[in-house]
């Protein structure tokens, strides 16, 4: 069974985030995000994450993709024709392969399928990971947007975080 979640970045109160279909628990998506963040030198981490946020353009799932978006998704190997409507006219298919891939955004990926509504789904959004640039923390939520833990972006230790999250 899939463990659905959310990955996003918050700046000046505004979220840019996406739905993640599987392995969203702390030992899956959570660990990937923490490891990816820890690969950025601490001296550069906050500035780099601000740049990433500023570079992201949200696209909506119900929008009709332009040819530019279709070409971009195919060129960047984001398209997955085995899900949903199996069409390049389906935004979910176009951006399926970047779900949960913070590393892709750190490497310049500029489009993100807007999953912000999913964050408020307390039943189906089991875990959420928000890089909060207003507080310079990684905010970890369960059951939608119920904050459970905030950890300084410059002090991320997976084992400590995993142990703290065991009670949730």
Language-model features, listed with the residues they occupy:
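Short, solvent-exposed aromatic-acidic interface loops
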Residues: 18-28, 145
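Short beta-strand segments
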Residues: 5, 15-20
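Short acidic-glycine loop/turn motifs at beta-strand connectors
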Residues: 9-14, 132-135
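Low-complexity intrinsically disordered segments
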Residues: 40-168
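Extracellular/luminal recognition modules and glycoprotein regions
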Residues: 3, 24-30, 34, 102
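Short, basic and Ser/Thr-rich N-terminal targeting/leader segments
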Residues: 1-3, 125
């Amino acid at each position: 069974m899939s463990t659905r979640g959310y990955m996003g970045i918050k700046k000046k109160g505004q979220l840019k985030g996406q739905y993640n279909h599987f392995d969203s628990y702390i030992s899956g998506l959570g660990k990937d995000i923490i490891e990816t963040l820890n690969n950025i030198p601490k001296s550069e981490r906050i500035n780099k994450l601000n740049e990433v946020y500023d570079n992201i353009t949200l696209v909506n799932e119900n929008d009709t993709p332009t040819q530019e978006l279709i070409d971009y998704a195919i060129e960047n190997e984001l398209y997955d024709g085995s899900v949903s409507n199996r069409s390049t006219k389906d935004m979910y298919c176009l951006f399926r392969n970047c779900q949960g891939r913070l590393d892709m955004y750190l490497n310049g990926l500029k489009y993100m399928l807007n999953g912000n509504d999913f964050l408020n789904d307390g039943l189906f959004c089991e875990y959420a990971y928000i890089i909060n640039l207003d507080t310079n923390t990684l905010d970890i939520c369960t059951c939608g947007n119920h904050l459970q833990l905030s950890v300084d972006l410059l002090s991320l230790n997976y084992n400590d975080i995993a142990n703290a999250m065991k009670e949730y």
